[in-house]
């Protein structure tokens, strides 16, 4: 879903690597 995808992008940008919302929902 788009909301989860948005979280994924935000987390990935923060960590500079792929981070999935179900692994790091808090970023």
From Swiss-Prot:
- KW Glycoprotein (keyword) present: no
Instruction: Name the Gene Ontology molecular function terms of this record.
Output: metal ion binding; phospholipase A2 activity; toxin activity
Instruction: List, separated by semicolons, the cofactors it needs.
Output: Ca(2+)
Which enzyme type, at the first EC level? hydrolase
Q: Name one GO cellular component term.
A: extracellular region
Q: What is its main location?
A: secreted
Instruction: Provide the free-text tissue specificity comment from this protein's UniProt record.
Output: Expressed by the venom gland.
Where in or outside the cell?
A: Secreted
Q: What is its EC number?
A: 3.1.1.4
Q: How is the cofactor bound?
A: Binds 1 Ca(2+) ion.
Q: Does the keyword Nucleotide-binding apply?
A: no
List keywords of the entry alphabetically.
Calcium, Disulfide bond, Hydrolase, Lipid degradation, Lipid metabolism, Metal-binding, Neurotoxin, Presynaptic neurotoxin, Secreted, Toxin
Q: Which InterPro entries match?
A: PLipase_A2_dom_sf
Provide the reaction this enzyme catalyses. a 1,2-diacyl-sn-glycero-3-phosphocholine + H2O = a 1-acyl-sn-glycero-3-phosphocholine + a fatty acid + H(+)
What function does the entry list? Answer: Heterotrimer: presynaptic neurotoxin. Inhibits nerve-evoked twitch contractions but not responses to cholinergic agonists acetylcholine and carbachol and to depolarizing agonist KCl. Causes a fade in tetanic contractions. Displays a triphasic mode of action with depression, enhancement and blockade of neurotransmission. Does not display myotoxic activity such as changes in baseline muscle tension or inhibition of directly stimulated muscle twitches. All subunits are necessary for maximum toxicity. Monomer: Snake venom phospholipase A2 (PLA2) alpha chain that has enzymatic activity. PLA2 catalyzes the calcium-dependent hydrolysis of the 2-acyl groups in 3-sn-phosphoglycerides.
Family to which this protein belongs: Belongs to the phospholipase A2 family. Group I subfamily.
Query: Any extra detail in the entry?
Result: Preincubation of this protein with monovalent antivenom or suramin prevents or delays toxicity, respectively. Antivenom fails to reverse neurotoxicity when applied at point of 90% neuromuscular blockade. Treatment of this protein with 4-bromophenacyl bromide drastically reduces enzymatic activity and toxicity, presumably by alkylating a His residue at the active site.
Query: Quaternary form?
Result: Heterotrimer of alpha, beta and gamma chains, each related to PLA2.
Q: What is this protein called?
A: Phospholipase A2 P-elapitoxin-Aa1a alpha chain
Which organism does this sequence originate in?
Acanthophis antarcticus
């Amino acid at each position: 879903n788009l909301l989860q995808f948005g979280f994924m992008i935000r987390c990935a940008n923060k960590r500079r690597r792929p981070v999935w919302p179900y692994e790091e929902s808090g970023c």
